[in-house]
Each structure stands twice: as structure tokens, then as C-alpha cells.
């Protein structure tokens, strides 16, 4: 990824956190965190990685709400960041958070077995 794409991704991450936390009022969108934004080299596509608090059903509802609000979110980003063309947003779940929690629980389980 180019240096410019990295900078745009970081700025988008900051702005998306604000937009999703303060501007959106969709009840389907629960408590979520933008963990990363990867912007393509030509600045046309942005993969937005999110982490959602809740079960699988809540995660799916959040994704549906984000898909419905994608146009509004993109226009807000366009108003806040000066780019010739605002990147197309693609929302994806960040599996690394769940993976990290799973590893942590396995290590804790091993530690309790060692102390017994």
C-alpha cells in the first residue's frame, strides 16, 4: 500500500469512528469499533474492518444497518476529507479480535491445568 493510501486510510478510520459513533441513529447498528481501514493504491476502494460487541445475530444486524447507511457514510467522508473521489466502502468483520480472545482463553485454560 502506498504512503498516501495509508494516510488516507488512517484519516478515514478516525472520521468513520466519529460518524458511526455520533451521526448514525440506526438501531440495528450496535456498539462497534473501526479497527482498521485499508485503502487500495488508486484510492477507489476502502475495506473497513469492524469489531462488534454481541453475538452472531447482532453482528449480522449491524452489517445490514451499515449496508443501508453506506451512501450516507460515504457522503459524510467526502465532506470531511478532500479527495477527488471518495472511496467505495466495503465493511468486513475483523476476525483478529475474536482470534486473539480465543488464544487468550486457551492460554488461561492451560495455565489453570498446570497449577492443578
Curated annotation (Swiss-Prot):
InterPro entries: KH_dom-like_a/b, RbfA, RbfA_dom_sf, Ribosome-bd_factorA_CS
GO cellular component: cytosol
Gene Ontology molecular function: ribosomal small subunit binding
Keywords in alphabetical order: Cytoplasm, Ribosome biogenesis
Compartment(s): Cytoplasm
GO biological process, any: maturation of SSU-rRNA
PROSITE patterns found in the cross-reference section: RBFA
Subunit structure: Monomer. Binds 30S ribosomal subunits, but not 50S ribosomal subunits or 70S ribosomes.
Family of the protein in this entry: Belongs to the RbfA family.
Function of the protein: One of several proteins that assist in the late maturation steps of the functional core of the 30S ribosomal subunit. Associates with free 30S ribosomal subunits (but not with 30S subunits that are part of 70S ribosomes or polysomes). Required for efficient processing of 16S rRNA. May interact with the 5'-terminal helix region of 16S rRNA.
Protein name: Ribosome-binding factor A
Native species: Bacillus pumilus (strain SAFR-032)
Amino acid at each position: 500500500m502506498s504512503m498516501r493510501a495509508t494516510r488516507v486510510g488512517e484519516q478515514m478510520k478516525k472520521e468513520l469512528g466519529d460518524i458511526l459513533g455520533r451521526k448514525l441513529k440506526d438501531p440495528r447498528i450496535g456498539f462497534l469499533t473501526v479497527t482498521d481501514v485499508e485503502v487500495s493504491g488508486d484510492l477507489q476502494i476502502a475495506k473497513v474492518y469492524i469489531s462488534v460487541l454481541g453475538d452472531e445475530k447482532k453482528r449480522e444486524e449491524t452489517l445490514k444497518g451499515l449496508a443501508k447507511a453506506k451512501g450516507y457514510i460515504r457522503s459524510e467522508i467526502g465532506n470531511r476529507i478532500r479527495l477527488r473521489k471518495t472511496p467505495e466502502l466495503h465493511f468486513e468483520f475483523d476476525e483478529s479480535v475474536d482470534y486473539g480472545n480465543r488464544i487468550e482463553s486457551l492460554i488461561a485454560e492451560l495455565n489453570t491445568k498446570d497449577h492443578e
